From Swiss-Prot:
Taxon lineage: Archaea, Methanobacteriati, Methanobacteriota, Thermococci, Thermococcales
Gene for this chain: fen
Magnesium keyword on record: yes
Subunit structure and binding partners: Interacts with PCNA. PCNA stimulates the nuclease activity without altering cleavage specificity.
Binding site for Mg(2+) 2: D173, D175, D236
CDD domains assigned: H3TH_FEN1-Arc, PIN_FEN1
Disulfide links within the chain: none
Keywords: DNA damage, DNA repair, DNA replication, Endonuclease, Exonuclease, Hydrolase, Magnesium, Metal-binding, Nuclease
Family stated for the protein in its record: Belongs to the XPG/RAD2 endonuclease family. FEN1 subfamily.
Function recorded in the entry: Structure-specific nuclease with 5'-flap endonuclease and 5'-3' exonuclease activities involved in DNA replication and repair. During DNA replication, cleaves the 5'-overhanging flap structure that is generated by displacement synthesis when DNA polymerase encounters the 5'-end of a downstream Okazaki fragment. Binds the unpaired 3'-DNA end and kinks the DNA to facilitate 5' cleavage specificity. Cleaves one nucleotide into the double-stranded DNA from the junction in flap DNA, leaving a nick for ligation. Also involved in the base excision repair (BER) pathway.
Protein name per its UniProtKB record: Flap endonuclease 1
InterPro entries: 5-3_exonuclease_C_sf, Flap_endonuc, Flap_endonuc_arc, HhH2, PIN-like_dom_sf, XPG-I_dom, XPG/Rad2, XPG_CS
Region (I-domain): 116-258
Residues covered by region (Interaction with PCNA): 330-338
């Protein structure tokens, strides 16, 4: 879900090519969820192989990653670990929402209402361990590094960006800024023409760059105050925030209150100060290596085509594109591709 503070934040529109030569840590769960939600058949059914195993995430990961690399981007994917205890309520709520959407999807299918069915099917998307392991395996075969976060993937990606190991972190959620990423790229894995939900209208989605320094300067806040603002309007750890407080009103409160959380802690079901501390000092790890390698073409064909029934012609075309990028790069050589 993330934090609903987007309307307050200064953003810069980018072209993918503006990120040429940049290393970017991508929130893997965020990207995979997008692939599961958008890469579906007309009735909302996800792509599946002959054994009924979902493959939408593999299709998205394979072809979208190649697109990023053709633009000169060096992607690394960061996977979630164990969520904090106070995220339990939000995860339970999401599970309920998925179950409700699944029921509505089945009803819409029975009625032959394909547009409605697809809408509910997207909301029913769910990530499980099998999908995660498949995604990691594909990335390894493609020569793309992935990192296992001890807790939140966004926090780990932000840590990597703050260390300078990557140029930016990428996610749809603004939480990355709360975790301290100096640069956040949004829309990285959904760039292109996208259909608006429930409408026969398409829009052009472009990447956005948000700089933490610009955000703090624009809002006249410290990062600590930005976190307090987010808690007041609601985060994944206290969904909905404080009743009656929107972003603009919450901004005024945090600006002029030394301890804005104290007033609301008394009636909160969760420890607001624990949430603040988690954003300031989340669990992270240095146990990772960002090494980009040549793809294992034979194993990719075996994994995608033999095991999961992908079109061999399409996969081979993708591999040709991938091979071309890793051999010549876009405006950089093989030496700079492998350079950390």
């Amino acid at each position: 879900m993330g934090v609903p503070i987007g309307e307050l934040l200064p953003k810069k529109e980018l072209e993918l090519e503006n990120l040429n030569g940049r290393k970017v840590a991508i929130d893997a769960f965020n990207a995979i969820y997008q692939f599961l939600s958008t890469i579906r058949q007309k009735d909302g059914t996800p792509l599946m192989d002959s054994k009924g195993r979902i493959t939408s995430h593999l299709s998205g990961l394979f072809y979208r990653t190649i697109n990023l690399m053709e633009a000169g981007i060096k992607p690394a994917y960061v996977f979630d670990g164990k969520p904090p205890e106070f995220k339990k309520k939000e995860l339970e709520k999401r599970a309920e929402t998925r179950e409700e959407a699944l029921e509505k999807w089945e009803i819409a299918l029975a009625r032959g209402e394909l547009e409605e069915a697809k809408k509910y099917a997207q909301r029913a998307s769910k990530i499980n361990e099998i999908l995660i392991e498949d995604a990691k395996k594909l990335l390894e075969l493609m020569g793309i590094p992935w990192v296992q976060a001890p807790s939140e993937g966004e926090a780990q990606a932000a840590y990597m960006a703050s260390k300078g190991d990557v140029w930016a972190s990428a996610s749809q959620d603004y939480d990355s800024l709360l975790f301290g990423t100096p640069k956040l790229v949004r829309n990285l894995t959904i760039t292109g023409k996208r259909k608006l939900p429930g409408k026969d209208v398409y829009i052009e989605v472009k990447p956005e760059l948000i700089l933490l320094e610009d955000v703090l300067k624009e809002l006249k806040l410290t990062r600590e105050k930005l976190i307090e603002l987010a808690i007041l309007v609601g985060t994944d750890y206290n969904p909905g925030g404080i009743k009656g407080l929107g972003p603009k009103k919450a901004l005024e409160i945090v600006k002029y209150s030394k301890d804005p959380l104290s007033k609301y802690q008394k009636t909160s079901e969760v420890d607001l100060y624990a949430i603040k501390e988690f954003f300031l000092n989340p669990p992270t790890t240095n146990d990772y290596k960002l090494e980009w390698k040549l793809p294992d073409e034979e194993s990719i064909i075996k994994f995608l085509c033999d095991e999961h029934d992908f079109s061999e012609e399409r996969v081979k075309n993708g591999l040709e594109r991938l091979k071309k990028v890793t051999k010549t790069g876009k405006q950089f050589t093989l030496d700079t591709w492998f350079k950390k």
